[in-house]
């Protein structure tokens, strides 16, 4: 969903607020306690969404980040790349998917993944904790990656690293990833010595490993997902742990996100 909504009670003054991730800015913090604050800090659709949030969100004690899904009354929503289809129409005024909590409003605020909030008469909170992983046997995959790493050349050149990322993203936009040899062969001459074919082989192996993990995830909820009318799975998953890790189906969703026109 989008945009990201941050809301809750600021422990510094005990006041309820709403905002986007700009509440965590180092400079020009945009935190909204009133409708006047929203008018001063935001404009357009984001301002309209924040006004609805200020009116209808419950005044919780903590601080939560959620994805905006939409205004109630329907059963199909497309806040961003994905289109969500609910089994029955949503009766509440607004719909959000909470996923992260904080203890303070600060640029250094520590994020804790995993939030469940009870829906109210005015706000429907989507359960983002309704997935589990059926642990696959990945020992062979890990062993193959470990065997390649000693022969993998990693560049200290930040420009070379950035260039390689851009190259990978270029192919993801196209929805196709060529083999490691091809990717190394098309590098600009000045970067070819910064990495080797094994570098891309390791990337390929890690990509395949993440895909296997994604295939092992089971979603228990009944929300259906679509991209351009075609059924698809959820965009990504984050492990609930002290060291959270995000898994995203890059070929499907990163490609769609790269080519997305925001509708908010």
Describe each model-derived feature in a short phrase.
Residues 3, 8-264:
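Core nucleotide-handling region used for phosphoryl-transfer chemistry
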């Amino acid at each position: 969903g989008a945009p990201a909504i941050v809301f809750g009670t600021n422990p510094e003054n005990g006041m309820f607020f709403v905002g986007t991730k700009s509440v965590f800015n180092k400079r020009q913090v945009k935190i909204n306690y009133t409708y006047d604050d929203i008018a001063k800090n935001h404009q357009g659709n984001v301002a309209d969404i924040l006004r609805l949030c200020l009116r209808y969100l419950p005044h919780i004690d903590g601080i939560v980040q959620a994805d905006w899904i939409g205004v109630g009354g329907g059963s199909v929503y497309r806040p961003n790349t994905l289109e969500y289809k609910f089994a029955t129409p949503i009766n509440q005024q607004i719909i959000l998917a909470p996923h992260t909590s904080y203890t303070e409003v600060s640029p250094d605020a520590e994020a804790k993944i995993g939030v469940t909030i009870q829906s109210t008469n005015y706000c429907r909170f989507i359960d983002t904790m309704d997935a589990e992983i059926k642990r696959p046997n990945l020992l062979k995959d890990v062993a193959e990656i470990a065997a390649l790493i000693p022969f993998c050349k990693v560049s200290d050149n930040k420009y070379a690293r950035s260039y390689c990322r851009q190259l990978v993203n270029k192919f993801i936009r196209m929805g196709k990833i060529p083999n490691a040899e091809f990717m190394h062969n098309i590098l600009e001459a000045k970067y070819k010595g910064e990495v080797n074919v094994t570098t891309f082989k390791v990337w390929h192996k890690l990509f395949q490993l993440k895909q296997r993990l994604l295939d092992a995830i089971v979603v228990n909820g009944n929300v259906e997902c679509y991209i351009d009318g075609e059924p698809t799975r959820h965009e990504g998953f984050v492990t609930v742990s002290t060291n959270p890790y995000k898994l995203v189906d890059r070929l499907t969703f990163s490609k769609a996100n790269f080519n997305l026109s925001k509708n908010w």
